Amino acid sequence: MSEFKNVTIIREANVYFNGGVTSRTIIFDSGCKKTLGVMMPGDYEFNTGSAELMEILSGDLDVLLPGADSWQTIKGGESFDVPANAAFKLKVKSLTDYCCSFLD
């Protein structure tokens, strides 16, 4: 889906890693939540509270998912799932546009 209708957008940005990763929170009438953001090239580690679906809209990165022994390459148009209460690592190779859906 390239467009969301009838949503609430939180005006203040979520800013991480000194601006290397930024996003805006979108809340749907149903109560479900997503963030739309941009990641600059760099190495990042995130911790989840809820399970997440990370959709990479453009760009490319490598992800090390919880329990994995090797990095997985993800490009624009691909996605990956992250379990709740877990940590995952990213090596962002180019400016990356993403949509994160919170699944819990």
UniProtKB/Swiss-Prot annotation:
Q: Which Gene3D superfamilies match?
A: Jelly Rolls
Q: Which InterPro entries match?
A: Ppnp, RmlC-like_jellyroll, RmlC_Cupin_sf
Identify a single GO molecular function assigned to this protein: thymidine phosphorylase activity
Its catalytic activity?
Answer: a purine D-ribonucleoside + phosphate = a purine nucleobase + alpha-D-ribose 1-phosphate; adenosine + phosphate = alpha-D-ribose 1-phosphate + adenine; cytidine + phosphate = cytosine + alpha-D-ribose 1-phosphate; guanosine + phosphate = alpha-D-ribose 1-phosphate + guanine
Q: Name one Pfam family in it.
A: Ppnp
EC number, as in UniProt: 2.4.2.1, 2.4.2.2
Q: Which CDD domains match?
A: cupin_PpnP-like
Gene Ontology CC: one annotated term: cytosol
In terms of superkingdom, the source organism counts as Bacteria
The protein's job, in short, is: Catalyzes the phosphorolysis of diverse nucleosides, yielding D-ribose 1-phosphate and the respective free bases. Can use uridine, adenosine, guanosine, cytidine, thymidine, inosine and xanthosine as substrates. Also catalyzes the reverse reactions.
By sequence similarity, the record places it as follows: Belongs to the nucleoside phosphorylase PpnP family.
Record's protein name = Pyrimidine/purine nucleoside phosphorylase
- Lineage of origin: Bacteria, Pseudomonadati, Thermodesulfobacteriota, Desulfuromonadia, Geobacterales
